[in-house]
Every structure is written in structure tokens, then in C-alpha cells.
Amino acid sequence: MKLTNSGFQRGYNPIVVEGDASDMNMDFGELLMEKGDTVSYNEPKECIYVLVTGKVTFRWADKEETVERKSCFHEDPILLHVPQNTAVELMCQSDKAEVSIQRTTNPKHFEPKLMKGEDLLCGSELRGAGLMNEASTRIVRTFLDRSNCPETNFFIGEVVSYPGKWSSFPPIPTRSLRSTSISSCPKMATAMPRWETPSIKFTTTTPPAWPTA
């Protein structure tokens, strides 16, 4: 976790950097943009650009699409997933926009893809409901893993936590976790895949109030 008194600044704000620690296998940061800003990337890594809020035009591989996300708490994710050495341009169309950027070393090639709610491995799944007096109720949105993109080195998504609730599994014995289904989503396996050295990123956010939508 990175703590700051002044908040994120306009431009790219690095939070973690691949290689800073022996088990840090990815870069992660937040890009803050203002209307008219244009930012270009061509990274030697697999990259995922997640629109957190705002209206942005993505340009990549001779394609272009303008997308908008008004609330990361109430709306499905929108993200651009590209392999290494893919030129990407982002243009801010709203007064402000925020984009979460994840990168990891991966030489494998795959087709770049702009993903929306219907493209996700499992979107807006309510987990923990009805258990422990709702102490672990949360919304889990799984973008992708190797079941829907075999070439990726990411297992990535968003977790929206309610105020005062656990943002993941509450403390339980590891032995119990081995026999616990991690998802009720029909698209996902009922056990965590065992990969050799995956890069894992879950963006955890807490809304100001219980969602009504």
C-alpha cells in the first residue's frame, strides 16, 4: 500500500515496480488525466489499462473506441488488454479520468482486446452474502485468467468492499481454504488454478455507501 497526503498527481503515479522485491512480478500505478490529455505507451510487457472513472478514447492496433465509466462501484469494468510491444494511446474526453495500469513481463503473443462487462470471466459476482452476518459480503469482478486467456500472466479483477466488511476471505485455517469453493460463477472453476509463477493483482476499493444500483 502506498500512503500519500496529497493524493495522486496528474500523470502516471507508480505504486509498485516489478523487481523492487524478489516476489514483485508486476508494475502497478494510477494514471490521472484531464480533458485533452493524450498519453502514449509501447511497453515491452503485457499490459492492462483499466478505466476507473471518466471518459477515455483508447487507440491500439489500428482500432479506436471511446468508453465511459461514471462509477467503479456501481458499473462493470472496462479495460484494454494488450501483449508486449503494443502501441496504445489514451485521450481524456471528460474533465478528469483515472486509469489503473498493470504490467508484467510476458513474451507470449495474443490478440489485444477491449473488454467490457459481457467479456469478463465473471462480472459483478456477490460473494459472502448470507454468511457471518454479512461480515464478508463483497462484489468480485474477475476480468481474466488463463482459462479465458491462456497466454496471460495475470489473474486480475476488482473487489468492491462494503464499509466495515472484510474485503476477501475472513481469517480461516489454510486447511479449510483448500476445500472451499472460491466462486459461484459458472464461468469459473471451483478451485484456484495452480500456476507456476503468476502475477496476481486485485484492485480493492471501498465505496462511500452501500450501493443501491
Question: What kind of region is each of these model predictions?
Answer:
Residues 38-39, 77-90, 166-168, 211-213:
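Histidine-centered metal-chelating micro-motifs
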Residues 43-63, 164, 175-213:
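Glycine- and acidic-residue-biased ligand/ion/polar-headgroup-sensing regions
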Residues 98-159:
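Surface-exposed beta-loop interaction hotspot
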Residues 28-32, 48, 79-81, 101, ...:
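Conserved hydrophobic/aromatic beta-strand scaffold that supports enzyme active sites
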Residues 37-70, 75-79, 88:
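N-terminal functional module of multi-domain proteins
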Residues 71-110:
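Ligand-binding loop in jelly-roll beta-barrel domains
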Residues 7-38, 134-181:
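A short glycine-rich, His/Asp/Glu-containing loop-to-beta-strand
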